Amino acid sequence: APSRGLGDVYKRQIQVYYASLSNEEDKVDAIYHFLKQGFRYGARVLDMHGLVQVCRVYELYRSVSNENQKYRGFVRFAEIGRQGRKILLARIRPKNQLLPLLGQHFADRFGQENFAIIDDERAMGYFHGETAFLSKVDMAQIDRLWQGQRDTAYEELFQTFFRSIAIKERENYVCQRTMCPIRYRDYMVEFSGGKADEETQMAGGRLQMVENRTESMGTGTKQMGSHKIQGEHKA
């Protein structure tokens, strides 16, 4: 079969790289078996979705890619430090290891800025200045900086803006939670305290009640369907 070109090779490398950033325990085995199939079939392995190994790597890739895409829009930077020695600091708590991806994304956009992105779950940070690097961090020190040296003036302005553009009659917390799940909101300034956060928490509680009720109704429907089928068999 003719070669499918560098594009497919690059695509395969991207999928494997993203899969390696997954938090799933089986990622190493999945990548190993995927590569074995790749050496056997070549670039066309990417289209062989009937192979379990190919499907699993694609699932891992898609999970990391989707979470990375969301965090690109949900990362919020705060100004940290004293006058003349300030940096932009963002904190995240992702399921997967996103620092290499997010770091490069924001380095391309804030090339002249000194910034850091901290992954609270892994106690790691991506630091960008004259050079860029990943490093383990002391979370106690990060907490002290976050609480004691964060400039909140712009945060308060953004919270005011967030509330002022809202249209009361069009508020839809179910849709909001779908588009911006609660697990992403820990360090999103528009949800960190104040009226917006209180309303969101109340809405989250109401939504959970609806979900529980829907789940109970679904269980009841399944049981009724099961009894009906059994009755038909007896008849």
Please identify what each model-predicted range represents.
Residues 1-10:
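Single conserved hydrophobic/aromatic residue that forms the stacking wall/gate
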Residues 47-137:
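Internal, well-folded beta-alpha domain core
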Residues 136-138, 144-145, 152:
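C-terminal active-site/capping subdomain that shapes the small-molecule cofactor and substrate pocket
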Residues 14-67, 74:
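Charged, compositionally biased non-catalytic regions
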Residues 1, 222, 229, 235:
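Post-transcriptional modification and biogenesis factors for structured RNAs
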Residues 114, 126, 149-215:
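Long, compositionally biased intrinsically disordered terminal regions
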